[in-house]
Amino acid sequence: MPDRRQHRGPHPDDAALFGRPDVLHTLRLAAGDLAWLLGRQYAPTAALTLVGNHYQLHARQRQALARAVAAPAVAQARRQRQVPTAALAGMSLYVDGFNQLITIEVALSGGLVLRGHDGVLRDLASVHGTYRTITETPTALQALGTYLAPLHLQAVHVFLDAKVSNAGRLASRMRALATTHAWPWHVLLVPSADAVLRQTEAIVATSDSGILDTAVRWFDLAAAVVTQQVPQAWCVDLDVPPPLV
């Protein structure tokens, strides 16, 4: 069945699973326990099952923990390689195109975004191998360009997986927008964006944990855009110690 969604808004159960203070307290406790286990070399799948069963978490809550939680040493190592906005002037930025755009689209759609233990902003969208533009796509692209324009980057290289459906159309749309606004964007269709981003020494923009762990330097572009351009975004912060009770 074709994907006919016009938005990447919240899952019907998200208000109950992430919206109440008591639920957030439980999730933060669970996140802390999962980080503790990962830091002691527990297998990620086994650790998530153990924590999820203990706290009786819904599958979507477990998915959130899997994306947002890392072993403390891993999270710290990622933070140490993060670059501030001020360091971008005159540099080239390599952007994980679908990864960053979809997070901005989710935020604009009122969907849930997560801030993890490594400080990175992520979404819970399930877009694997297929992509279609939604109502918020033009606004998301404009927000991306509006944020990047004053940073005086030498170039912004946006990598899109060629095998993903509609990648070519999105690339054309981004190129046209960049030409209209004289943005220094180079939009590239490649066999694997992950492979390119894992190998470069340039500053990368992604929330993919595997890429972050190999990146020499990285910038949380989606988080910066959402913070500046989407102040109403629904962000659940799991990078907060659970309150004492």
Q: Can you annotate each of these PLM segments?
A:
Residues M1-L93, Q100-V245:
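Charge-biased, low-complexity intrinsically disordered regions
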